[in-house]
């Protein structure tokens, strides 16, 4: 990969490789509910790993129109870019080996077989973790009590981290129905990324997330200023961009959620029957 001064890959170069590179499928990610492939994109001497989800491989869902998940993933990325929070990895829709589909840059994580040699996972709890019942480390927030598969009582916790707090606000805005713990990735670059946004941006309330630790807490002023800018952009070029991938009703619903958060700047509470995605990890 083309290096930059700190020795890491240049994000702009990786974006270009993902957009224009020749794709080779390395393998299938079988834990995914839809057809999902790990690919290597080559452009000249440059290469990048990407996740490829062909539209033809999308499993039918009762509450989301068939063939729309790729557009929702791209729309979530566009919202992430507009917010300036760098939550969603670079995402496009392009042709691939199994037809047109969503393409997203792979996130190298510490300890991953695709990461750099020497990148080891940090010690201690993960950003989202299951711990023995009542064990809440400093800097963590409890979400719920549950039983694991062995029948032992556990506590679901997540870090009280600004990166996760922004992701929680992002999920409220895009109405994310599937924020599992495994959809939160710590990159070797120190960023925290959110992936798998195919079931988002519905007009009906479908928020399901493991990031409930801030329920009922006020949203800070800096975040509200960012949400206000998003609200305004949705009535301009951003709204037009999104309408190419989701319906105008869904764009209006996104705008309405931004307005609602600004009018009542408090994180929502889990008052629905199924507020946690299953499985949570």
Tell where the protein language model's regions lie, with residue ranges.
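Juxta-kinase regulatory segment immediately upstream of eukaryotic protein kinase catalytic domains
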Residues: 1-19
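Broad phosphate/nucleotide-binding scaffolds in NTP-utilizing and phosphate-metabolizing enzymes
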Residues: 2-4, 148-150, 245
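Conserved ATP-binding subdomain of kinase catalytic cores across diverse folds
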Residues: 16-149, 153-154, 169-177, 188-195
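C-terminal catalytic region of ATP-dependent kinase domains
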Residues: 65-66, 187-281
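Helix-boundary and loop/linker segments of multi-pass membrane transporters
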Residues: 156-160
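Alpha-helical scaffolds flanking conserved acidic
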Residues: 162-167
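Short, glycine/acidic-enriched loop or turn micro-motifs at the edges of active sites
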Residues: 174, 181, 199
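Hydrophobic residue at the +6 position relative to the catalytic HRD Asp in the kinase catalytic loop
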Residues: 182-186
